[in-house]
């Protein structure tokens, strides 16, 4: 059985440490547990890393589209690898959760996240799994809008705590991945 794990993020060096790229950062941590590297796949609108485990194949996907067009890459990978919607896990930032909190579940809404909205629209289904990683809200929403906040870099202290945060996330999804 093949499973897709898709990290939501924006391509480009200027976005590497932004809150919106937490999905890419999480995938980097997950990928470090396996041997291999991400390969560019223009036809899939992403880079990917294919991992064979005793429980099946896991394909890690980093879309090369921007966040709002994530569904295009998800659909291309779904078709190419022959994965069911239920075999897809999307890793995304969540401003409605405190920094460091996690939610893992299936059949849920987008919660205002444009990448998840687009994915649901393109797949015509919300039956995929979501790992929502809390990034918090702007401390002063009147002076810093949500878009500016998710495109801002993590603070020094937040960056220091990402590994522990991601370890919790990996532990949460391990049964779904089959290890």
From Swiss-Prot:
The active site is at 20 (proton acceptor). The keyword tRNA-binding applies. It is found in: Cytoplasm. Gene3D superfamilies: Peptidyl-tRNA hydrolase. GO terms for cellular component: cytoplasm. One of its GO terms (molecular function) is peptidyl-tRNA hydrolase activity. It is an enzyme of class 3 (hydrolase). The record marks 10 as: Discriminates between blocked and unblocked aminoacyl-tRNA. Pfam families: Pept_tRNA_hydro (PF01195). It catalyses: an N-acyl-L-alpha-aminoacyl-tRNA + H2O = an N-acyl-L-amino acid + a tRNA + H(+). It comes from the Bacteria. Its main location: cytoplasm. Signal peptide: none annotated. GO terms for biological process: protein quality control for misfolded or incompletely synthesized proteins; rescue of stalled ribosome. The record marks 93 as: Stabilizes the basic form of H active site to accept a proton. Keywords: Cytoplasm, Hydrolase, RNA-binding, tRNA-binding. InterPro entries: Pept_tRNA_hydro, Pept_tRNA_hydro_CS, Pept_tRNA_hydro_sf. TRNA binds at residues 15, 66, 68, 114. Belongs to the PTH family. NCBIfam families: pth (TIGR00447). Hydrolyzes ribosome-free peptidyl-tRNAs (with 1 or more amino acids incorporated), which drop off the ribosome during protein synthesis, or as a result of ribosome stalling. Catalyzes the release of premature peptidyl moieties from peptidyl-tRNA molecules trapped in stalled 50S ribosomal subunits, and thus maintains levels of free tRNAs and 50S ribosomes. Monomer. This is Peptidyl-tRNA hydrolase. It comes from Chlamydia muridarum (strain MoPn / Nigg). The gene is pth.
């Amino acid at each position: 059985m093949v499973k897709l794990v898709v990290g939501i993020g924006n391509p480009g060096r200027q976005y590497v440490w932004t809150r919106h790229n937490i999905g890419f950062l999480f995938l980097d941590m997950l990928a470090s547990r396996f041997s291999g590297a991400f390969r560019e796949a223009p036809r899939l609108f992403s880079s990917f890393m294919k991992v064979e485990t005793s429980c099946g194949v896991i394909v890690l996907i980093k879309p090369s589209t921007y966040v709002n067009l994530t569904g295009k890459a998800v659909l291309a990978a779904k078709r190419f690898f022959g994965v069911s919607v239920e075999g897809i896990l999307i890793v995304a930032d969540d401003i409605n959760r405190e920094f460091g909190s996690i939610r893992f579940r299936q059949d849920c809404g987008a919660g205002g996240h444009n990448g998840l909205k687009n994915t649901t629209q393109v797949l015509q289904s919300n039956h995929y799994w979501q790992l929502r990683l809390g990034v918090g809200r702007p401390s002063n929403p009147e002076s810093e809008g949500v878009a500016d906040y998710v495109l801002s870099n993590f603070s020094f202290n937040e960056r220091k705590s990402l590994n522990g945060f991601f370890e919790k996330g990996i532990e949460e999804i391990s049964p779904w991945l089959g290890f």
